[in-house]
C-alpha cells in the first residue's frame, strides 16, 4: 500500500513502502546503460540497483554507528553549514546530516572517511555509470551523509548547487 504524505510545501504524494509497490524502472549498470541513459535524459533521474554491495552498505552503517554516532564533539553539517553536535530523534537517528565526508577530520574519523573514499567515492560501478551519463570522468564537488529524514522541501538539486552551465552537474543518492 502506498503511503499518502504531504510535502513540506503541502503537495500530496504517494510514497511506496516497498520496492514491489514502486513502478519506477531500475536499471542494471552492466548490460542496460543505453536504456538507462535514455531514461535519465528523458526524466532527469535514473535508478540503478546494486551498484554497491549489501556488505559494503552494512560495513558503512557499522562504521557510522561506531565512529560518528557516539562522537560528542562538533561536525560540519549540511543543513545549517555550521559545526554542530549530533542531533538525535526518538529513533536514535542523527537528524543533522554531515556535509563533505571527504573533509572529516582524519585524526578523529579516519576509518569512516577512508572507507567512504575507497568503497563509495572510488567505486568502479558508480564511476562508470557517472562517466556514461556525463560523458566525462566524474568529480566530487560535495558529499553528504543523511541518517534521518530532515524533511527537506521539494526542490531540484540545482537550486542549491550546480555547474557554471546550469544542468550540467548531477547528483548520486545512495540508499
Model-derived segments and spans:
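Non-heme Fe(II)-dependent double-stranded beta-helix
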Residues: 2-42, 49-156, 160-163
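Short, conserved beta-strand element in jelly-roll/cupin
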Residues: 162-175
Amino acid at each position: 500500500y502506498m503511503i499518502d504524505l504531504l510535502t513540506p510545501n503541502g503537495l500530496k504524494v504517494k510514497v511506496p513502502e516497498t520496492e514491489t509497490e514502486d513502478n519506477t524502472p531500475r536499471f542494471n549498470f552492466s548490460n542496460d546503460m543505453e536504456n538507462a541513459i535514455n531514461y535519465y535524459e528523458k526524466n532527469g533521474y535514473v535508478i540503478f540497483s546494486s551498484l554497491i554491495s549489501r556488505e559494503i552498505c552494512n560495513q558503512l552503517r557499522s562504521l557510522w554507528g561506531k565512529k560518528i554516532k557516539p562522537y560528542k564533539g562538533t561536525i560540519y553539517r549540511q543543513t545549517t553549514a555550521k559545526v554542530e553536535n549530533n542531533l538525535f530523534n526518538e529513533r536514535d537517528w542523527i537528524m543533522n546530516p554531515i556535509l563533505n565526508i571527504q573533509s572529516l577530520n582524519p585524526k578523529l574519523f579516519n576509518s569512516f572517511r577512508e572507507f567512504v573514499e575507497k568503497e563509495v567515492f572510488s567505486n568502479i560501478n558508480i564511476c562508470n555509470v557517472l562517466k556514461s551519463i556525463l560523458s566525462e570522468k566524474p568529480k566530487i564537488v560535495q558529499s553528504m551523509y543523511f541518517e534521518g529524514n530532515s524533511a527537506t522541501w521539494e526542490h531540484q538539486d540545482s537550486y542549491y548547487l550546480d555547474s557554471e552551465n546550469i544542468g550540467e552537474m548531477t547528483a548520486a543518492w545512495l540508499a
